[in-house]
């Protein structure tokens, strides 16, 4: 259960960071 919560928080942090960068600048990576 502890690892699940850790992964959930980590994923949420990464998603927030990704969306912040994505909305700040036009996507330049990949596609």
From Swiss-Prot:
Pfam families, per the entry: PsbT (PF01405)
Keyword Transport listed: no
Keyword Membrane in annotation: yes
GO CC terms of this entry: photosystem II reaction center; plasma membrane-derived thylakoid membrane
One record GO biological process: photosynthesis
TM stretches of this protein: 3-23
Swiss-Prot/TrEMBL keywords: Membrane, Photosynthesis, Photosystem II, Thylakoid, Transmembrane, Transmembrane helix
Topology versus the membrane: Single-pass membrane protein
Main location per the UniProt record: membrane
InterPro entries (UniProt xref): PSII_PsbT, PSII_PsbT_sf
Localization per record: Cellular thylakoid membrane
Family, per entry: Belongs to the PsbT family.
Subunit note: PSII is composed of 1 copy each of membrane proteins PsbA, PsbB, PsbC, PsbD, PsbE, PsbF, PsbH, PsbI, PsbJ, PsbK, PsbL, PsbM, PsbT, PsbX, PsbY, PsbZ, Psb30/Ycf12, peripheral proteins PsbO, CyanoQ (PsbQ), PsbU, PsbV and a large number of cofactors. It forms dimeric complexes.
Function statement: Found at the monomer-monomer interface of the photosystem II (PS II) dimer, plays a role in assembly and dimerization of PSII. PSII is a light-driven water plastoquinone oxidoreductase, using light energy to abstract electrons from H(2)O, generating a proton gradient subsequently used for ATP formation.
Name under which the protein is recorded: Photosystem II reaction center protein T
Provenance organism: Synechococcus sp. (strain CC9311)
Gene: psbT
């Amino acid at each position: 259960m502890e690892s699940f919560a850790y992964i959930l928080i980590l994923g949420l942090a990464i998603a927030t960071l990704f969306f912040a960068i994505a909305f700040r600048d036009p996507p330049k990576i990949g596609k």
